[in-house]
A protein has these predicted regions:
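Charge-rich, well-structured scaffold segments of protease-associated domains
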Residues: 1-3, 22, 77-225, 231, ...
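His/Glu-rich zincin catalytic helix
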Residues: 1-80, 185-287, 326, 330, ...
């Protein structure tokens, strides 16, 4: 009978460092040259997330409307030129940052760069396009707000940070009625500037490609007035139930306010979260799905922002088993606080985390994503090896100690949206 080979965690990981260039306006450009890939991916990361907006929805509207017409190109022309050359662009926005990413074949980078220049530097935000966008998003949000999952997610953010905190605030769909071109243009002018931007490029970054990227980046204007974002204190609530008549399922969010990625306990807490609910065979999945059949899926994860972070557990269960599901989640947390994780389980989790790191870093795009995350946290790519080493050194005793320290029931926030009648 063949034996399974022993599980081993890599002792180190070699990730290329990004080469740093500085545009004439001071914006940093981080280049990861992988000439064997005949593609170029270019990301502009602006400190222009929702915490920086002065009016509801202007941060997301600004990012999403960059390609809806420029000084020289209509939205249709932008889309057609990208499509013709097999290029694409993607928009992502979170509480802190907006990420504008373009990807093209190396041989078609120049015509793609023409579009990039228009989208990043010369958007027009026409009133007509804004009205169409606002109406569509208002309807989408109204539909989303009927779902218990959306209700629980938004209420959980408010419970963790406070209803008026930029990380917790949620606007009603009616706020889209006040969205206007003037406010979007104002947000763009304040936040899409040289001081608020970093650029990360990966793939076949030849001298010619780099020169073109620098020429575009150099045109970003300087910030007219320096801004310091001052975040208010957190106001945490611990137990919230939201009645949603007719709901067949309850959406559960549980967790607590913690810390950013730079905290010394962040990586071992990632290991703890993985054990608890971070993969298909995790404790919460085994209990609530496999043993009790309460849900199709449940997960836990460490969520991080620039200035804060939290642990989140999320699932949806039938309304009739809501209380039983909450009891089982509490039971698994209590077990982590009182019993040691077996060496076999801990080794499995460590290997899965190491394997996921290897998978993400297999190619220039994944390396670019990790590089971006490291830059925003103040690290370079040597931090990846440090994280892997920290995962390897995490012990069962440390997991139990962290659970006792951070998963005290009195500190946990629980939000449930469903029909309790």
């Amino acid at each position: 009978m063949k034996q399974q080979p022993p599980l081993t965690i890599p002792t180190t990981i070699d990730v290329p460092q990004a080469k740093i260039h500085t545009a004439p306006n001071g914006t940093k450009i981080y280049a990861i040259n992988c000439p064997e890939y005949e593609v170029v991916r270019l990301s502009f990361i602006f400190h222009a997330g929702s915490i920086t907006q002065r009016h509801p929805f202007t941060a997301s509207a600004t990012a999403n409307m960059l390609a809806e017409g420029s000084e020289r190109m209509t939205s249709q022309q932008i889309a057609e030129q990208l499509d013709y050359y097999g290029s694409y662009f993607d928009i992502n926005i979170d509480r802190d940052y907006s990420y504008i990413t373009f990807c093209s074949l190396s041989k078609f980078f120049e015509p793609t760069a023409e579009v990039i220049e228009q989208v990043i530097l010369h958007p027009t935000f026409s009133e007509n396009e804004v009205a169409i966008y606002a109406d569509k998003r208002r309807q989408q949000l109204a539909i989303e707000r009927r779902k218990v999952e959306t209700i629980a997610r938004e209420q959980f953010a408010q419970a963790i940070f406070g209803k008026e905190h930029p990380y917790g605030i949620c606007y009603t769909e009616n706020a889209y009625e006040s969205l206007c071109s003037e406010n979007i243009a104002e947000h763009y002018k304040r936040r899409y500037t040289a001081e608020n931007c970093i650029v990360v490029c990966s793939g076949s970054i030849t001298d010619k490609v780099l020169e073109r990227i620098i020429s575009i980046t150099a045109q970003l204007p300087h910030t007219a007035i320096s801004e310091t974002l001052e975040l208010p204190p957190y106001h945490t609530q611990h137990d919230i139930r939201i009645q949603h008549d007719g709901a067949l399922q309850s959406s559960i969010r549980m967790g607590r306010l913690l810390f950013t990625r730079t905290h010394e306990d962040f990586v071992p807490m990632q290991v703890l979260s993985m054990v608890l609910g971070g993969y298909f065979g995790s404790r919460l999945m085994q209990n609530l799905r496999e043993q009790n059949g309460f849900t199709y899926g449940i997960f836990s994860a460490m969520v991080n922002f620039q200035n804060s972070g939290y642990l989140a557990i999320a699932t949806q269960v039938g309304t009739e088993v809501t209380e039983a599901a909450l009891e089982q989640i509490a039971l698994e947390i209590d077990t982590l606080r009182n019993e040691l994780v077996s060496e076999q389980e801990l080794l499995l989790v460590k290997n899965m985390m190491a394997g996921e790191m290897m998978r993400i870093l297999d190619g220039p795009f994944g390396i670019a994503d990790v590089t971006t995350e490291n830059i925003l946290c103040g690290f370079d790519n040597s931090h990846i090896a440090d994280n892997l080493d920290r995962i390897r050194r995490t012990t069962a005793e440390e997991i139990r100690s962290l659970a006792q320290k951070y998963l005290d029931p009195k500190d946990m926030v629980t939000v449930v949206a469903g029909d309790f009648s």
